Design a protein with these regions (language model features):
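Short, acidic/hydrophobic/Gly-rich beta-strand patch recurrent on exposed beta strands
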Residues: 61-64, 128-130, 268
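Short, solvent-exposed loop/turn elements at beta->coil junctions and helix N-caps
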Residues: 10-18, 104-105, 111-113, 117, ...
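Extended interfacial segments that mediate partner engagement and assembly in macromolecular machines
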Residues: 1-101, 136
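Rossmann-like S-adenosyl-L-methionine
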Residues: 138-377
Length: 377
């Protein structure tokens, strides 16, 4: 009901080689069948370095849909091969160093999860080992052996999570066991620092497609003030500030990034600094409240870039956006249902939907990322 005769609906932008694309791989480690002659390692939580072999075989891989049952997998056509190799190497080293896998029901065991991040262009690997306790006595040998088995690894981080929960990363502290504690990747001609908590798209190839199309839809000429709402670590905002490789004149004069996650804003500022970008500022604040404040202060905005979470935006944000009345809105969404709801609101309040571009960010799944471009009538 909100698309007009002139709205352009582009075909889905697919991926040429839709395999091994996931640059973030997460695996739980859980006990499987009992092993013959196995005895519980010393210490109530089966900590690293204890004597004795694990009581159970160790399962790692992925959860069956809608369950907590782990499907033991040695390979996956969607996961980066080096990342998968690291997951399996950790399982092997757990057996060697007598580290018990985590039992969620009993809250026992030592190794809970591994989260592997891969730099698509650099090939660097960040391994985050989530442990049920701070003590990691064999950490130096563990890291040395892990690096031997997976030479692409450039850093290893320990994340502590002792809570009886299925939340993966804990908030009880992190320790860098090897390397700098982060990796570097390149996207649209910019470099980005990725740590264990950083948000970063899991398909770098299609992210380039997504961002290029979004920047093109913004029609930057070098004079605009743009806002990157729900900016995360600032990726698309920084691309807007600098311009795409080969088309650097098509950029915003000034970019304001806003997100309510303080650690993401810290990363965004650091990303701006090491890319030498001085025309982008980032603020840790609720996007809706920030927009409301700008509207009340009489600020003007030419282009609004927005990439909200799956739940979509909210009426406060959309109302403030309409008050600021940017000439163009480029709305990126991982949930076309909530995007349609929000776009309908914008169309009812003075905007025209001009173009729609779906991008297949997750081949072989039913998920699609969608970009909508709107212009003020």
């Amino acid at each position: 009901p909100f698309a007009g005769e002139g709205t352009v609906f582009n075909p889905i932008a697919g991926m040429d080689e839709p395999y091994y694309y996931r640059n973030k791989v997460t695996s739980p480690y859980v006990p499987g069948r009992k092993t013959k002659g196995g005895k519980r390692p010393q210490g109530k939580k089966g900590n690293a370095g204890a004597k004795g072999a694990p009581q159970h075989e160790i399962l790692c891989g992925m959860y069956a849909a809608g369950t907590h049952r782990v499907i033991n997998t040695d390979s996956c056509l969607l996961e980066n091969k080096d990342a998968k190799q690291a997951v399996l190497a950790i399982r092997s080293l757990m057996q060697r160093y007598h580290m018990e896998p985590y039992n969620e029901d009993a809250n026992t065991g030592f190794i809970r999860h591994a989260v592997i991040r891969v730099g698509h262009t650099t090939g660097e690997l960040l391994v985050t080992v989530v442990t049920n306790g701070k003590e990691f006595p064999a950490s130096r040998n563990f890291c040395r052996e892990l690096k031997k088995r997976c030479p692409a690894i450039t850093t290893v981080v320990q994340n502590v999570n002792t809570r009886q929960t299925n939340v993966i990363l804990g908030d009880e502290g992190e320790k860098t066991l090897y390397g700098p504690g982060f990796i570097i990747d390149e996207l649209c001609g910019l470099t980005f620092r990725i740590s264990s908590h950083s948000f970063y798209q899991v398909n770098a190839t299609q992210t380039e497609v997504l961002y290029r199309k979004a920047i093109e839809m913004a029609h930057f000429t070098g004079t605009e003030t743009a806002m990157d709402a729900y900016c995360g670590t600032g990726t698309i905002g920084l691309v807007a500030a600098k311009g795409l490789p080969g088309a650097e004149t098509a950029h915003a004069a000034r970019v304001i990034g806003v997100d309510n996650v303080a650690s993401a804003i810290k990363d965004a500022r650091e990303n701006a600094r090491h890319n030498g970008i001085e025309n982008a500022d980032f603020t840790a604040e609720d996007a809706g409240q920030f927009m409301d404040k700008l509207a009340k202060e009489g600020e003007s905005l030419d282009v609004l870039l927005m990439d909200p979470p799956r739940a979509g935006s909210n009426e406060q944000f959309l109302r403030s956006a309409c008050s600021l009345a940017p000439k163009r809105i480029v709305y990126i969404s991982c949930n076309p249902n909530t995007q349609a709801r929000d776009v309908e609101y914008l169309v009812k309040h003075g905007y025209r939907l001009t173009e729609v571009q779906p991008v297949d960010m997750f081949p072989h799944t039913n998920h699609v990322e969608n970009i909508c471009a709107l212009e003020l009538q």
